[in-house]
Amino acid sequence: SFMESELLRMGKGEYDLSEMFIVRQKYLNQLEDNYYRGGNGNLGQGSLSHTWKNAFNQVGIVPEEVYHGINYNSEKHNHGEMVRYINALGNTAVKMKRRSPEYYKLINNLFDTYLGELPEKFTYKGKEYTPKSFAESLGLNMDDYIELTSVAHKPY
């Protein structure tokens, strides 16, 4: 990932950061956005670089060895089935025009089932962290990164 490369560039060493830790928060953010857009948000797979930055700032990060994000019988990530359930739950909340406490339990149970339970604390290289404290220990400031977009209808 880009941030792992940044850590190398900064002289922080090699890290294997958990992509799925960020993906879980990405889906939670998409569900919120979809609800506020009356069902017109994007609940699909994939994202943009600011999605990673936002999730990192919200919940932190963990090493891959702490959160693999595969909690089912597969060696590779396959979110097709999970995304169908995400869409079903997200669209049901929109149709009902409310999100009950049970809705949030269902969403978190869905992610726990497919991605695994989130660690509140973990030990990495002999030191105890929370996802937020681990993120802080990396020294990555998301405000140091900007996104650029090139479009065909504007000159370079």
Task: For each feature predicted by the language model, list its residue ranges.
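Catalytic-core signature of thiol
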Residues: 3-156
